[in-house]
């Protein structure tokens, strides 16, 4: 699939499989444009992707919303011994700190766990 084909698929709300790099994590991510996410997309990712369901946002939106990286949140905690702090402050095998943040839920969700709740949160984040 060419880059143009992948972009067209994303614009239609279809999944694109994205391989990050054999020199990094060497994994394939299922990617779909947030504005099109449905509960069916979430179910498919949950059942077939085998990992976290993540929403990528740009850093300026994250800062505006006060969404700090989990690494920064944990590293500022005084409740870790030196072994735990070493694990938190360490780098991933690909050379960076993990860039995950905290879990978020839209205010109209119930638990945030269901496919419907997750899809709603992701779609609404696309509107920001």
Where are these regions (language model features)?
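Catalytic domains of riboflavin
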Residues: 1-128
């Amino acid at each position: 699939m060419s880059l143009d084909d992948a972009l067209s698929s994303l614009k239609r709300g279809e999944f694109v499989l994205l391989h990050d790099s054999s020199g990094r994590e060497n994994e394939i991510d299922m990617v779909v444009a947030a504005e099109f996410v449905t509960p069916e997309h979430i179910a498919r990712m949950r059942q077939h992707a085998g990992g976290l369901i993540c929403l990528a946002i740009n850093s300026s939106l994250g800062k505006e919303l006060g969404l700090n990286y989990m690494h920064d949140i944990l590293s500022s905690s005084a409740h870790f011994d030196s072994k735990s702090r070493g694990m938190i402050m360490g780098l991933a095998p690909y050379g960076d700190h993990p860039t995950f943040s905290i879990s978020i839920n839209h205010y109209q969700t119930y638990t945030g766990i269901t496919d419907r709740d997750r899809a709603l949160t992701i779609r609404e984040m696309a509107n920001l």
